[in-house]
Regions:
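Membrane-integral, polyisoprenol-dependent glycosyltransferases
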Residues: 1-158
Length: 158
């Protein structure tokens, strides 16, 4: 993936990367700001992940987009891992390829925004809910709650 091959260009990419940059410069990892003004449009999780990435790999487009690329890759893998025992290797591979090659999945994997992470947590919640319906257990249900909570920390009810 060529994550750093073009500048941050979308309004969302600018807002997310700007708020993350300000988070790193002012040291406030609880409240987000952009140009000194509060930015409470989105919950905090994606900013933390971008801050980790930028701290580890430098202040580049690639580093801001890395959390989205990793979340999209995990999303495809999770769908494949869920489909494989139910459909077989070849159909599960086809499902993963179709997801991977869809413009939506490809697009959000390349943007510094919260969408890929939210899709990963939604997929995990739905998959664990399905597993709960297959074989009810409190553990499966708790995992559904965890994925939903992480989804709320990603995109939230804000």
């Amino acid at each position: 993936m060529n994550l750093g091959g073009w500048p941050l260009f979308d309004v969302d990419e600018g807002a997310f990367s700007g708020a993350t940059t300000e988070m790193l410069s002012n040291g406030n990892f609880i409240s987000t700001f952009i140009y000194g003004a509060p930015r409470f449009d989105k919950p905090i999780l994606i900013y933390w992940l971008q801050a980790l990435s930028v701290t580890a790999f430098g202040h580049t487009e690639w580093a801001f987009r890395l959390p989205s690329a990793l979340a999209s890759s995990l999303w495809v893998w999770v769908v494949f891992a869920f489909a494989r025992p139910r459909l077989g290797n070849a159909p599960a591979s086809l499902v993963a390829a179709m997801l991977c090659l869809s413009i939506a999945c490809w697009g959000i994997a390349h943007f510094a925004s919260a969408d890929a992470l939210l899709n990963l947590f939604l997929a995990l919640a739905f998959i664990d809910m399905y597993r709960y319906w297959e074989q009810p257990s409190a553990r499966q249900l708790r995992r559904v709650y965890v994925w939903i909570a992480l989804g709320l920390l990603t995109k939230g009810p804000v």
